[in-house]
Amino acid sequence: MPKAKVTKNSIAPVSSNPSANRTPVKINSTGTPMWYKVIMFAFMLVGLLWLVANYLVGPQIPFMNELDAWNYGIGFGLLIIGLLMTMGWR
């Protein structure tokens, strides 16, 4: 009668409780400081408010009227800075 092939899985001892072999690891994570979160959300909020103000009252505000299409760059730039900061948020 032919014999079955021996595989690595059949040789290795199988533990009934796989977590018994593991040692607990402490995660030393303090999280993101409060000032980082405040600045991140402030960038996003100011960018959004800049775009809304440009849309609603842009022609009536002299310096926003002079910036013309740069208002979109400023507004979206502030939003993008806030969104890029979310990658550092833990």
Swiss-Prot record:
Give the InterPro entries listed for this entry: CrgA
Biological process (GO), any one: cell division
Localisation: Cell membrane
Q: Which Pfam family is an annotated match for this chain, by its short name?
A: CrgA
Topology relative to the lipid bilayer, per the entry, is:
Multi-pass membrane protein
Region (Disordered) residue ranges read 1-26
* Principal location listed in the UniProt entry: membrane
What keywords were assigned to this record?
A: Cell cycle, Cell division, Cell membrane, Membrane, Transmembrane, Transmembrane helix
Ranges of Polar residues composition bias in the record: 7-26
For this protein, the parts annotated as crossing the membrane are 38-58, 69-89
State the GO CC annotations: plasma membrane
Q: Which family does it belong to?
A: Belongs to the CrgA family.
Task: Provide the function of this protein.
Answer: Involved in cell division.
Give the protein name, as stated in the record.
Cell division protein CrgA
This protein's encoding gene: crgA
